[in-house]
Amino acid sequence: MKIIFNADDFGISPGAVYGILESYKRGVVKSTTLLANSPAFDLAVEVAKENPGLDIGAHLTLTFGSPVLQGLETLTDDDGRFRRNYTALENGLADVDMNEVERELTAQIEKILDAGITISHFDTHHSIEPLIYPVQHKLAEKYGVSIRRHSDVSDFGAIKTPDLFATEFYADGVSFETIKKLVQEHIGTNDVVEVMTHPAYIDETLREISSYVEPRIKEVSILTSRELQAYLGQQEVEIISFRDL
């Protein structure tokens, strides 16, 4: 089997940037996805350019912070900010203009590209793929990138995806045993499994803007541990990135 350890939220805070960098340089993370509207976007771009082996994707969002574009009436609240989570977006989906969705997501992608970063894949913040999949699919075809797999779609056409998207390594599931169990379920197969991760060093920016905080430092510890890397080696698990699909 092959595993992609993808670190979400690249750029959400300086601590997240450095936590992901540590998980790449000393651990098993080879792919990460960058938030174009994040507070530490410029730092993330700088770190990405200094570490060209770190595979970068776009962490497309309609539920975090403010949009890259202005005047998106169906996607924002009275303060011009995105709705705060999946449920809020889903509840207002009937009123959302999908043309606005495409324009904004394109702007996020182009901002990353304009910063000199090559993008290999797309995923989304708060896993909103089921709500916007036709737009995401169209943009993936346009930019020639891979996407994160999700259970609502069975046929991804010519777009490359892993065979499985694993969300178990999150919150109370952040443990070596979680990854070990996943490996045991797929060992001896040709499956490519993406494991969602959120490693970060905790800082005030992260505390202010994210509800998922404390487990992130534990993720750094596990993803950089010799125990995990030795186990994956013993099981002959190949660690790859989205570039390798």
Curated annotation (Swiss-Prot):
Keywords: Carbohydrate metabolism, Hydrolase, Magnesium, Metal-binding. The keyword Metal-binding applies. Its cofactor is Mg(2+). InterPro entries: COD_ChbG_bac, Glyco_hydro/deAcase_b/a-brl, YdjC-like. Its EC number is 3.5.1.-. GO terms for molecular function: deacetylase activity; hydrolase activity, acting on carbon-nitrogen (but not peptide) bonds, in linear amides; metal ion binding. One of its GO terms (biological process) is polysaccharide catabolic process. Disulfide bonds: none annotated. Mg(2+) binds at residues 59, 125. Probably catalyzes the deacetylation of acetylated carbohydrates an important step in the degradation of oligosaccharides. Belongs to the YdjC deacetylase family. Homodimer. This is Carbohydrate deacetylase. It comes from Listeria monocytogenes serotype 4a (strain HCC23). The lineage of its organism: Bacteria, Bacillati, Bacillota, Bacilli, Bacillales.
